[in-house]
Structures are given as structure tokens and as C-alpha cells.
Amino acid sequence: MESSVERKYSPALNWTITEDNEARPAALHVILHKREYVFPWSRYIYADGGNDHVLIAFPTHEVVITGYGLDHLLVDLAAHRVKCLREASRADTFRAANEPEPKGAIMELVVREIEE
């Protein structure tokens, strides 16, 4: 039996999406601690995964994500609404007791170049 109490979540941690009234972004911006990538959505091939793991494929690179609530990220990727993915910082592992849980979070983010 489902609870009748609606659970409140804070926004996803380490990814940002467009609002409903905004245009879709032209590219996906991936921010790592020491490097940044910009992948045009026109070169997007597919995304695959589940709640704790997502792979995003482009012709030259793969973006590998681990975390939780990533099924929400897959929905946003399918709609091309994701503007930015950020590598997690140490502070992201802590939150105040009175803060609502994020709907999902990226805990590890890796970009791999595809070798031909």
C-alpha cells in the first residue's frame, strides 16, 4: 500500500535541467574538477542505465555516471532537457538534517574518449 503522504524532494544534485518554459539546450556541458566538455545534443547517440548507473554515448566519448535516483536523469536525457552535469565534490556527501533529500544525485562522473 502506498503512503498518502507526499514526499518532498529537493532538486537533483549535480545536474541541471531547463525549466518547462525554456528552450532545449543546444549542448550538454560536463564539468569535471580539472576539465570541462561541451557535447552538442545533435551528436547524442543514446543513454542507457537505471537508478544507480547511466551511460551517455556520443560518437567520440562516453559519459559514465554513478549515483542514485538516476532514473530521473534518464527521463531528462530522453527529453534533451539536461544543461549541465557536474562532478561531485566532498561537500555533496553531507546535508543538513532539515534539508529534504535530493530527487537524485551524481556521485561519480567520468568522461572516456572512445578509441577507434
What is each of the regions a protein language model found here?
Residues 1-22:
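Anionic N-terminal interaction surfaces
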Residues 14, 65-116:
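Helix-rich interaction surfaces within compact, conserved domain-sized segments
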Residues 19-21, 36-37, 46:
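Short, conserved, surface-exposed binding loops centered on an aromatic residue
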Residues 21-26, 48-52:
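A short, compositionally biased
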Residues 24-38:
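Short aromatic-glycine motifs in intrinsically disordered, low-complexity regions
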Residues 40-50:
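Phosphoinositide-dependent membrane-docking surfaces
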Residues 45-47, 61-64, 71-72:
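Short, surface-exposed beta-strand-loop junctions and turns on beta-sheet-rich folds
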Residues 50-61:
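Short acidic, Gly/Pro-enriched loop/turn segments at secondary-structure junctions
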